[in-house]
């Protein structure tokens, strides 16, 4: 427990809009370190020689006597800042990354027991291959039945991303450090609960800043999807091309069993991305300036895909 030493915490977790894939979550934790105890090269430190890379770190917030996990991962780097002057304090910044780093560092080839199976079963088979703990998984059954694993040399994260694209679902590390695999129907059908509503009208939850964007970042009007062993399935929207020029996107070697499934995925991508969209990039909250009890909860209780 090092809360009393912490001066700043920054957490970044989310999905890349261009690739439609979740990326590794990161966190920077800055500590006051006037004694040098958090300098990993200091032999006089009470923690020496145990300040090494990949030590586990858990970041949580407490509200109304309940703990809310914000990040669970591993310390990647210890950055020490030696500051001089009457008003300066030496600090150490712990640069952290979530379990995606471990998945990306675990090489696999043949996946045991991975014949024709549901996408969720394939996720579990890949995680079994690298001995990922059962207690750190939250895996949907999935809505697609996949081909047998190709058995190529790759890392576990690449294999999981292939399943994610084949399912047309989502896979990420949640704030508790669990691998979450969400099926495509769950992505569409499952509403977030509880619902937090934001407004600037003096009702609901107030915010200090909301960044709204309207651009072509997500625009794709020509889509080609190719399954492993299949032929490219292409769909396009000519009115969108005429209006916004050509924006092409491709996926290859997904593991669905038929060309019809690949075509259905291409049609789904085109339907949702052929036109520019208005989106909220960020909402900034000041958790101390409002009596609405849902405001702090909105700051600590919202998970990815909520």
State each model region's role.
Residues 1-117, 121, 125, 129, ...:
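Assembly/oligomerization scaffold segments
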Residues 1-3, 115-116, 158-165, 170-306:
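Acidic, small/polar-enriched beta strand-loop surface segments
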Residues 134-151:
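Short, conserved helix/loop micro-motifs enriched in His/Cys and acidic residues
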């Amino acid at each position: 427990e090092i809360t009393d030493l912490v001066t700043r915490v920054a957490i970044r977790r989310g999905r890349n809009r261009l690739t439609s894939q979740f990326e590794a979550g990161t966190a920077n934790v800055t500590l006051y370190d006037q004694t040098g105890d958090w300098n990993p090269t200091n032999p006089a430190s009470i923690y020496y020689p145990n300040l090494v890379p990949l030590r586990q770190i858990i970041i949580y917030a407490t509200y109304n006597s309940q703990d809310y996990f914000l990040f669970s991962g591993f310390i990647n780097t210890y950055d020490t800042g030696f500051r001089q002057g009457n008003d300066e304090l030496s600090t150490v910044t712990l640069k952290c990354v979530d379990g995606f780093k471990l998945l990306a560092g675990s090489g696999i080839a043949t996946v045991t027991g991975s014949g024709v199976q549901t996408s969720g079963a394939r996720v579990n088979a890949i995680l079994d291959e690298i001995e990922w703990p059962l207690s750190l998984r939250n895996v949907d059954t999935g809505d697609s039945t996949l081909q047998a694993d190709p058995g190529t040399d790759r890392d576990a994260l690449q294999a999981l991303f292939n399943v994610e694209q084949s399912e047309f679902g989502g896979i990420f590390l949640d704030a508790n450090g669990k691998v979450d695999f969400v099926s495509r129907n769950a992505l569409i059908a499952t509403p977030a609960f509880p619902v937090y509503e934001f407004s600037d009208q003096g009702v609901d939850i107030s915010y200090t800043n909301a960044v709204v964007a309207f651009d072509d970042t997500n625009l794709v009007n020509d889509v080609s999807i190719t399954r492993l062993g299949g032929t490219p399935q292409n769909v396009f929207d000519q009115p969108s091309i005429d209006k916004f020029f050509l924006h092409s996107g491709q996926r290859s070697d997904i593991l669905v069993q038929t060309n019809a499934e690949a075509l259905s995925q291409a049609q789904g991508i085109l339907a949702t991305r052929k036109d520019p969209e208005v989106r909220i990039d960020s909402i900034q909250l000041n958790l101390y300036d409002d009596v609405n009890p849902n405001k702090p909860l909105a700051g600590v209780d919202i998970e990815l895909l909520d």
